[in-house]
């Protein structure tokens, strides 16, 4: 009986954390003029999400600002190409959808490209903050994980789709919670996937 209040309290704490992380991500993205801010803000959010998932208690705003400054150049190098690729694919998808049935194969191709990009990105960002890797070194490793762990990849895409759908139904969530919730869930899941992968590659006693 006493477990339910504890679980409810923990769930509320996680929602509050996700909302605070979401707000910090928005504020620091805008502080960089959106284009220059989204890279370091995203890396900072994933860095703090990793530390939170590992049980650390930390001053969010001060630590966010510190990582944001430290990762300003590398964060942009990591994130901006992903944002640009997503923008091009989404724009082409909408364009081909507007052309009707004649462009259906091209529409499906761009949709497949968007799904593949989402899958790679879902591994790439948590990987960058978890391992000591250069931005360009993350892409091939994340791509291999997409193929090597199909069940994990499907789960990540399902969670992403659920967050996006919830934000679409309740637009307030998109502003107040969606990005922070996805970043925290994405990081939490990937830390477990990385641990499983390492255990498989380096079994104990071998």
Predicted regions and their residues:
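Helix-coil boundary and N-terminal low-complexity module in membrane systems
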Residues: 1-106, 110, 117-206
